[in-house]
Amino acid sequence: MNPPKPFPILCLLFLAIEEVFKALDPIEIINFSIISKRTKGIAKQMSFFPKYSMGLFINETLDIMFCGTGDMVSWFYAMTSDIKMDGKIEEDESDGCIIRRVFKYSKDPVEEWKQLFKHVREIFKKQTIDVLRITVDSFLGQNVSIIEYLKVNMKSVDLCYLFQTNYINNVDKHTAYLLDNIKIISELTHYLYTENYDFDGKIPKNLQHLCIYNSQWFGFERLLIHDETKEISGGIDIRKIDGKTATFFVHYTGFSMSVH
Ligand SMILES: *[C@@H]1O[C@H](CO)[C@@H](O)[C@H](O)[C@H]1NC(C)=O
Ligand SMILES: *[C@@H]1O[C@H](CO)[C@@H](O)[C@H](O)[C@H]1NC(C)=O
Ligand SMILES: *[C@@H]1O[C@H](CO)[C@@H](O)[C@H](O)[C@H]1NC(C)=O
């Protein structure tokens, strides 16, 4: 039996190619775009990509995440150093949303993820990232290089979530370095066990939501430097420079702030 005839997508007219692309998911688009210079060039011309929001998730693997507006599926392209996972596809469901994760093995996952993200950012024309979720004590040896890379390759991140796996690891310096180098626009949620009272990381200004757990180290003065404050029941109100009000709630595990 003859092998199936390949579909000559590159011979189609541009509008027809675009229709074919609309039927592809982001992982298929990436796979197509890395075949050759020509396929990359074609992928770059597609106009409908802005509908995807994009995230970077760093934990045991380094993932690039896509989420379409409207459809309840998110796709993860995960770089792993575990060869047994190569080519595996995991499917999960969370809050009615389907999560599809494709694994790719690499001897040097950090390096390959960096290259892939650069490529993807170019194809999907993204200057900013919607979500950054980092377990700061994963890839410890490459902590600085990952942050420097992010600093150069994305303008800002909208939502940022910081985690830590092992409370024994001191991540104070790492976290301060991250906060100094990455611009966070609307939300920072922080689950780290920072305990160093000298922690001198900069907390981003103008956030709509700030949530810090395990925050024994955290001096309120750090937040109060620029604003007018008064205590109200159930929280501390801060009138921000832009006229909005932020309310702080102190919990036994930490505190949170929301702007309204
Ligand atoms: C990181 O990966 C570990 C192991 O798979 C998992 O237990 C943990 O929940 C993950 N952390 C985050 C923040 O996703
Ligand atoms: C895309 O490429 C990855 C990595 O090579 C592979 O595991 C996956 O099966 C491919 N996915 C599709 C939908 O072609
Ligand atoms: C990077 O991680 C190492 C531990 O592997 C730590 O000693 C160092 O302080 C960290 N540096 C920064 C800037 O995060």
What kind of feature is each model-predicted range?
Residues 1-260:
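Non-core capping and flanking segments associated with repeat-based/extracellular domains
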